[in-house]
């Protein structure tokens, strides 16, 4: 069958539409089967496990292409949820033969074995109904195969069996939380812990290197390079604390609220049982949501988590910028740090090496900040009993988690771990700074100290020479007071 004919059978539209739709398929199918939903029959590629509603969504939401597909963690979370739902539903009367087949099929989804059968994009209904039905249809057809039946026969029904006691309105917010909590625990927290540990190690390594401080990008009083890196380490530690503190709200699951939060079409105790099953399956402390109406109508937990990621991005932006500026040069910049040389930096300037890890990280931070805007707008658009920005909230949040996790790991491995101090340059800049004059304040007063600094700057002489010329100090007094190593903390 030609691509044109195949696509016509799928879309039923114009030649242009049909050809455009054909190009969106991951692979061109040459055979089809008939699937049905309440709208009637539709042709589905024979080699795909999805059914009628997924096929209609493919045709109705051709937005963004491959890069806009529903995030894989959401798909895997659907596998976890549907497996747990079947397990609990068997306690409430679901045929064990069907239930066990659903559990086996759902496990394959959770393991990522059926990812190619989840083609839908984020840009669909705001409740995520199409993706919920995608999961229901794939699991139903795979369960049918496990039972020795054919796809599309509906001996395992996507709604009656796989989606039993569920609504898209509670399943999608549930998988949002499962996916986010899982990714944060498995990816983000380990990456940030490693980055924090390495920054802390550098702080100790550099603890005795006294350097000039800078405020307003201008010279200030001294500190140690270790103190500077200690500030970075603490920022990351606080970021870890912030995101960890959001997890208790993510651990609350909406499942059991069904359509509007009342729990219609579920049995008493279903919500508690399924949360416990998910907790056991993921080894994370999931519980049923305290209030299902809040869990469906709002996504404040996701906004809160995204806010913590936004703060982490803010911290990492500052850290990466400081490090690349301190490493600027090699001859005409600040040059206090020597950054690892990972790759050639210019296609025209031979020998140039750039702070690429810092640049990559700062771009990631910008993206995370943008994602937080999307999550904030999405979270603010919960109308009455249902928020209908769920897919974009989930996508943006998971994108931020993955980006920060990966970028932090890359930054730690390819930059921070290999940073060295340029001791000679640091010492030179330290002893050229006019701000060492601050240590004279207690002895000669602010006004006299300012006069010393201005004279030294105007005449191009040293602070000591200026102080002696003004007659405010003896040489011995100056040498006793202006000791950078004694200016890095409170006096006794």
Curated annotation (Swiss-Prot):
InterPro entries, per the entry: Fum_hydII, Fumarase/histidase_N, Fumarase_C_C, Fumarate_lyase_CS, Fumarate_lyase_fam, Fumarate_lyase_N, L-Aspartase-like
Localization annotation: Mitochondrion
Gene Ontology molecular function: fumarate hydratase activity
Chain residues that bind substrate: 127-129, 157-160, 167-169, 215, 347, 352-354
Pathway linked to the protein: Carbohydrate metabolism; tricarboxylic acid cycle; (S)-malate from fumarate: step 1/1
GO terms for cellular component: cytosol; mitochondrion
Site description Important for catalytic activity, residues in chain: 359
Reaction(s) catalysed (UniProt annotation): (S)-malate = fumarate + H2O
Transit peptide, start-end: 1-28
Consequence of gene disruption: Embryonic lethality.
Enzyme Commission (EC) number: 4.2.1.2
GO biological process: fumarate metabolic process; malate metabolic process; pollen tube development; protein tetramerization; tricarboxylic acid cycle
Superkingdom, natural source: Eukaryota
Keywords: Lyase, Mitochondrion, Transit peptide, Tricarboxylic acid cycle
Activity control mechanisms: Fumarate hydratase activity (fumarate to L-malate) is strongly inhibited by phosphoenolpyruvate, citrate, oxaloacetate, ATP and ADP. Malate dehydratase activity (malate to fumarate) is activated by oxaloacetate, pyruvate, Asn and Gln. Malate dehydratase activity (malate to fumarate) is inhibited by citrate, succinate, ADP, ATP, glucose-6P and phosphoenolpyruvate.
Chief location: mitochondrion
Active site per the UniProt annotation: 216, 346
Function: Catalyzes the reversible stereospecific interconversion of fumarate to L-malate. Catalyzes the hydration of fumarate to L-malate in the tricarboxylic acid (TCA) cycle to facilitate a transition step in the production of energy in the form of NADH.
Assembly and interaction partners: Homotetramer.
Family: Belongs to the class-II fumarase/aspartase family. Fumarase subfamily.
Comment field (misc): There are 2 substrate-binding sites: the catalytic A site, and the non-catalytic B site that may play a role in the transfer of substrate or product between the active site and the solvent. Alternatively, the B site may bind allosteric effectors.
Protein known as: Fumarate hydratase 1, mitochondrial
The organism of origin for this protein: Arabidopsis thaliana
């Amino acid at each position: 069958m030609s691509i044109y004919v195949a696509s016509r059978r799928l879309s039923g539209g114009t030649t242009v539409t049909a050809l455009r739709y054909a190009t969106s398929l991951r692979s061109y199918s040459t055979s089809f089967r008939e699937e049905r939903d309440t709208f009637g029959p539709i042709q589905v590629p024979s080699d795909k496990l999805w059914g009628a509603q997924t096929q209609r969504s493919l045709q109705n939401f051709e937005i963004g292409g491959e890069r806009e597909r529903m995030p894989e963690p959401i798909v895997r979370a659907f596998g976890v949820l549907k497996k747990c739902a079947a397990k609990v539903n068997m306690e409430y009367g679901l045929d064990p033969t069907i239930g066990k087949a659903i559990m086996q099929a759902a496990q394959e989804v959770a393991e990522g074995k059926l990812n190619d059968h989840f083609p839908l994009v984020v840009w669909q209904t705001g409740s995520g109904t199409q993706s919920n039905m995608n999961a229901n249809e794939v699991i139903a057809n795979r369960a049918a195969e496990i039972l020795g039946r054919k796809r599309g026969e509906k001996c395992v029904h996507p709604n009656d069996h796989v989606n039993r006691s569920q609504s898209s309105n509670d399943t999608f917010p549930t998988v949002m939380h499962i996916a986010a909590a899982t990714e944060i625990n498995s990816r983000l927290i380990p990456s940030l812990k490693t980055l924090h540990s390495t920054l802390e190690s550098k702080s100790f390594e550099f603890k005795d290197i006294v350097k000039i401080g800078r405020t307003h990008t201008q010279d200030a009083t001294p500190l140690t390079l270790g103190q500077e890196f200690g500030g970075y380490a603490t920022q990351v530690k606080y970021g870890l604390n912030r995101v960890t503190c959001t997890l208790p709200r993510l651990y609350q699951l909406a499942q059991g609220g069904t359509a509007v939060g009342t729990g219609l079409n579920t049995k008493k105790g279903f919500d508690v049982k399924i949360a416990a099953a998910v907790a056991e399956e993921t080894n994370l402390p999931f519980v049923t949501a305290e209030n299902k109406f809040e869990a469906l109508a709002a996504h404040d937990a996701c906004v809160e988590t995204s806010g913590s990621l936004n703060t982490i991005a803010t911290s990492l932006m500052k850290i990466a910028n400081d490090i690349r500026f301190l490493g600027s040069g090699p001859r005409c910049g600040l040059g206090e740090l020597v950054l690892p040389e990972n790759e050639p930096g210019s296609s025209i300037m031979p020998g140039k090496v750039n702070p690429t890890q810092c640049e990559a990280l700062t771009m990631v931070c910008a993206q995370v900040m943008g994602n937080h805007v999307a999550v904030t707008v999405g979270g603010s658009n919960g109308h009455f009993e249902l928020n209908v920005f769920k897919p974009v909230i989930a996508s943006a949040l998971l994108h931020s988690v993955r980006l920060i996790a990966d970028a932090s790991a890359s930054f730690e491995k390819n930059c921070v771990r290999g940073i060295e101090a340029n001791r000679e340059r640091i010492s030179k800049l330290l002893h050229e700074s006019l701000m060492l004059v601050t240590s004279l304040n207690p002895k000669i007063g602010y006004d006299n100290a300012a006069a010393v600094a201005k004279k030294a700057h105007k005449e191009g002489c040293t602070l000591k020479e200026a102080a002696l010329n003004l007659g405010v100090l003896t040489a011995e007094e100056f040498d006793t007071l202006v000791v950078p190593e004694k200016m890095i903390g409170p006096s006794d």
